[in-house]
Amino acid sequence: MVRYMIRYYTIEKRNEKSKALSQILSRPCPWRCSPMHIPSCQTQELEILTFQQALVPTRNDYDRDQWHYIPDHYAEYRYLLGTRGKNPLICIGINPSTAAPGDLDNTLKSVERIAKGNGYDSFLMFNVYAQRATRPEDMDQVCNLALHRENMAAFRYVLEQVGEGYRPAVWAAWGTIIEKRPYLKDCVREMVAIGEEFHAQWLCAGKRSKKGHPHHPLYLRKDEPVRDFPVSEYLDSL
């Protein structure tokens, strides 16, 4: 009888733990619930469209007058996603995930809210590295120089989208993920150099990390203000 009761108690405890785990997994979670993109291979193994090639339209299933989407089809990389306007908030993440026009992930929804809350008429989502990978640890182990070169061409294009009379507002928002790959810091340095040609203003939002990395767009208030980001000092600290 005692042995039976002990066994029954053990089974009940296991059931309770299982229910508790199910409840935890059922809670909303932006990282878990969003669709994932796991790279099929290293991008060096792919035939990459140049940025100019990627500008050529191939689809008409979204409003081109409202959206920037380059390339305009789902691929292993993405150069640009955002809305059209004269005064965009240009957000810089580390690398793209699965978002597309009209199908924004939680990061892009946050970017859109913060852009609107700070008085910008649009947003442009750009990334330090163009490879799609929901999990940063799945990114290329070594920088694909061809992809990087075209991504920098895309960054120039992004800065050129700012209307006359407006200064490019570039929101550094890559978080601590920049530490995932050594080459990412060099990519940022080149972006900053290009930004100087356009007199870009670098911004950040939210609390910076202990090492000074700018906050990722997730988990920021919709009315979170953007503020100056001392990008030169930041680069010196890397």
Residue spans for each PLM region:
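Short amphipathic alpha-helices and their capping/turn segments at secondary-structure boundaries
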Residues: R78-R84, N106-F123, R156-G163
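Feature marks short, surface-exposed loop/turn motifs that line or immediately flank catalytic pockets
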Residues: T98, R132, I178
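Short connector loops at secondary-structure junctions
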Residues: D121-M139
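Active-site and ligand/interface coordination hotspots across diverse enzymes
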Residues: I6, W31-D105, G117
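Glycine/proline-rich loop-helix segments at beta-alpha junctions forming the active-site rim
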Residues: H37, M139-L238
